[in-house]
Amino acid sequence: MGALLQSGNVTPGHLVTWVTDGVVQDGGATPAAQRVLASLRGANFNITTDQPILIPLNFVAFQLTSIIVTNASISLTTAVGGFYPAGSKGGTPVVSAAQSYSALTTPAGLLAVTLASFGANTRFSSTNLGAIGGQLAIWFALTTAQGVNAVADIYLIGTDLT
């Protein structure tokens, strides 16, 4: 492959492929990559009520690959709880209600929670997730609260399948 001798239009965000020496063409869309799909900043780890994580409207279907919790305000020695596809701890858990957050001892700590089988092996969409005002959501709800004021940030990581 040498210098570019002829070029066509390549759609922004698409790959470029060589057709022959000096000629390129549109190579199609970039393969889906993992990224932050949604987040809940300052999630309260001292309550056991629902805390919905709203999925942006542009994600109609996605694969959840991990949930990361970080930036804990204090050492989360007591907090235990999971993630659910519906409010009031409804539906098959995405993350078990027994998930501990005790590994988070400093704001710099990072915990990739353990996805349950449903969380790791499901194509999420409106067929299996609840919604708030037409927006898909995954609910975070503790089984056991920390006992004192505590917050942390939660990030849903996945692949857009829209």
Describe the predicted segments one by one.
Residues 2-4, 116-137:
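Short cationic/low-complexity microdomains
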Residues 73-125:
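Terminal beta-strand-rich extracellular "head" domains
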Residues 41-43, 51-53, 126-128:
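Beta-strand-rich interaction surfaces with strong enrichment in secreted/lumenal proteins
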Residues 1-38, 48-50, 57-59, 71-78, ...:
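Extracellular repetitive beta-rich solenoid segments
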Residues 59-60, 100:
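Intrinsic disorder/low-complexity segments
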Residues 138, 152-154:
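Hydrophobic residues positioned within well-ordered beta-strands of beta-sheet architectures
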Residues 43, 62-68, 72, 79:
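Generic beta-strand hydrophobic packing signal
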Residues 62-66, 126-146:
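Noncatalytic modules at the cell exterior or secretory-pathway interfaces
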